[in-house]
Amino acid sequence: MSHKHALFNKVIAGLLAGLLTITAGGCSASDAQSLIDEARNYANSSQSSASQSSSSTSSGSDGTWSETDAPNYYKVTGKADFSAAGTMPSAGEIRYSELDSLGRAGMAVGVVTYQLMQSGSDRERDMPDTIAGWPEHNPKVEIVFSDGDKYHGYLFNRSHLIAKSLGGEDAERNMVTGTRTQNVGDNDATPGGMAYTESRARDWLRSHRNGTIEYMATPRYTGDELLPRTVDVDIRTSDGSIDEHVITYNTAAGFDIDYMNGGTK
């Protein structure tokens, strides 16, 4: 049964029950009309909420990447939207999702402060041995960028959802298996991939030590695939000077990523 039909049945059932109550109590026709109007308003508002929820869930999840549109493996698509997070954490705190049944990380959301950033930067790195989708063999590759530059090194990184340099922990629930380009783009003068928002956040906090940054990273998986096709990042500074929704693409030019199992095809 569709959501629309289920909602209709629910409203009608409530309406009939209410009318029976009104009839038994000998209430007026105006009371009955009031109940009908209330039911109609409920149906309209519920359908609107369901539509918004469906839209936010599917945003950016197909992972389609165009080198023309996103040569450095990220794309700014609008303003930040933290509605999926519900209540935001307190300043200086990060909230992580628990791993799902496939061992995959979910949404991570925090309110980053200068002190949290410093604590992450000062902390010793302690990376987990493996995460969901980590390949048995991580190939060394050459990736050619649109400007002709080349990267030589490992194809896959343990990519933080919220960077260690922003206070994010080195743990499975804060990491996805990402390509080198998803993690840092071409790693040149202009950071790309996840590094685009991470570098903007660090630079802003260094200039606004009493400010805060709302920051949320959401991996987007297709079905039971272990690797996300994209990671969506929402970032908003307390002064509003940065307010962006960013899609980072988990791919690499010239390679066919095996999103289901990890590695390449």
Explain the meaning of each model-derived region.
Residues 2-13:
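Bacterial N-terminal signal peptides that target proteins for export
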Residues 6-8, 50, 55, 163:
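Intrinsic structural disorder/low-complexity segments
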Residues 13-21:
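Hydrophobic helical h-region of N-terminal Sec-dependent signal peptides
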Residues 22-26:
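C-terminal motif of bacterial Sec signal peptides marking the signal peptidase cleavage site
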Residues 28-30:
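Bacterial signal peptide processing site
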Residues 32-84:
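N-terminal, intrinsically disordered, polar/charged segments of Gram-positive cell-envelope systems
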Residues 89-265:
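Domain-level detector of nuclease and nuclease-like folds
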